[in-house]
UniProtKB/Swiss-Prot annotation:
Gene3D superfamilies linked: Classic Zinc Finger (3.30.160.60)
PROSITE patterns cross-referenced by the UniProt entry: ZINC_FINGER_C2H2_1, ZINC_FINGER_C2H2_2
Source organism of the structure: Xenopus laevis
InterPro entries referenced in this protein's UniProt entry, alphabetically: Znf_C2H2_sf, Znf_C2H2_type
UniProt keyword terms in alphabetical order: DNA-binding, Metal-binding, Nucleus, Repeat, Transcription, Transcription regulation, Zinc, Zinc-finger
Name this polypeptide is given: Gastrula zinc finger protein XlCGF32.1
Function in brief: May be involved in transcriptional regulation.
Localization in the cell: Nucleus
Gene Ontology, cellular component aspect: chromatin; PcG protein complex; transcription regulator complex
Length: 111
């Protein structure tokens, strides 16, 4: 049995769930319906808002043992730790290394 997919009419990206498509579509409209009651910052989904709220409450923050910088998302701390370890995100095309994943992602567009 083939799974039904929900395709974005703007960019063609496919999703297995209609709710994921609905959340994704907000990136095209710019709408951020989930708003922080403390500072007014908006988010496209409730999960991202719940992570953000940790900044205000201090709850479940992940703290870097080397410099003390704190993150609401443990994965962001793991990426941050590369600054201290020197570990790089490597380009599979040319071997160039980047300390920041988003810099690698931008770099990959030139290949």
């Amino acid at each position: 049995k083939r799974e039904k997919s929900f395709d974005c009419t703007e960019c063609g990206k496919s999703f297995k769930r209609k709710s994921k498509l609905k959340t994704h579509f907000l990136c095209h409209t710019g709408e951020k319906p989930f708003v922080c009651v403390h500072c007014g910052k908006g988010f496209r989904d409730n999960y991202k808002l719940s992570l953000h709220l940790r900044i205000h409450t201090g709850e479940n923050l992940s703290v870097c043992p080397d410099c003390g910088k704190s993150y609401t998302d443990k994965n962001k701390l793991i990426v941050h730790m590369r600054i201290h370890t020197g570990e790089k995100f490597m380009c599979s095309e040319c071997g160039k290394g980047f300390s920041d994943f988003y810099n690698l992602k931008s770099h990959l567009q030139i290949h």
